[in-house]
Amino acid sequence: MPALRAVLFDLDGTLLDTAPDMVGALNKLLAEQQRVPLPYHEVRNLVSHGSSRLVKLGFPEVEPEVFASLQKRYLEIYAGALSLETRLFEGMDGVLKAIEGRGLRSGIVTNKPGWLTQPLLEQLGLTARFACVVSGDTVSARKPDAMPMLHAAALAGVPAEACLYVGDAERDVQAAHAAGMPALVATYGYLQPGEDWQAWGGDGSIAQPIDLLPWLERSGRA
């Protein structure tokens, strides 16, 4: 692996613990529709799959046109409560400081749309900490396509092969490898029970953010 020059992160379930607010928005939508809220633990592990999967969980039987309306309402609710409980995962602030201290760049590549990603980062005071932010609508393709990964590397000013990507879904590994980047699986993220993440072919895994530190030392800039 070439000398590491940048670390790129998935957003939901890797960099940020967004589940409390995303689950909260779903339960508010359910309440509006006179339905029983879902237990947090039943919803958390689907958060990485986005609003469509969450609304489908809450309303599995509705017709497509009704579903589209419910998803629109869900996004309205969530957009108004992006950062009530969302925070960096424990230890991630120290990891970002370690990346900065080694003279490496950091960035975000997420399938979350920019109209949600940018306000969320701004509300948490994180925008300036990243050399690049590529959202789900920044380029014409999303993960697992390589395009957003390559775009992030270009924005960060480093070759793709000098980037390390960290994510909690199979599409993260697929996108990174398609772009020529090594990928780590964040097993602390929103994996579903029994999900065989080892079959994704990642280059390693981290059970907590601080487990990323030894990988930074391999950059040769420790």
Regions found by a protein language model. Give the residues of each.
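Acidic, Mg2+-coordinating phosphoryl-transfer loop and its flanking beta/alpha structural elements
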Residues: 164-204
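Generic C-terminal helix-cap and adjacent flexible tail
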Residues: 2, 102, 210-222
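A structural signal for hydrophobic residues in beta-strands of small regulatory alpha/beta folds
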Residues: 15, 134, 185, 205-206
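Conserved SAM-binding loop
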Residues: 15, 88, 106-109, 141, ...
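N-terminal helical cap/lid subdomain that shapes the substrate entry/recognition surface
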Residues: 2-94, 100-102, 113-115
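Short secondary-structure boundary segments
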Residues: 111, 137, 169, 187-190, ...
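Substrate-recognition/cap helix-loop segment adjacent to the acidic, metal-dependent catalytic center
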Residues: 31-33, 37, 54-61, 85, ...
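Structural recognition of alpha->loop->beta junctions
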Residues: 126-133, 196-214
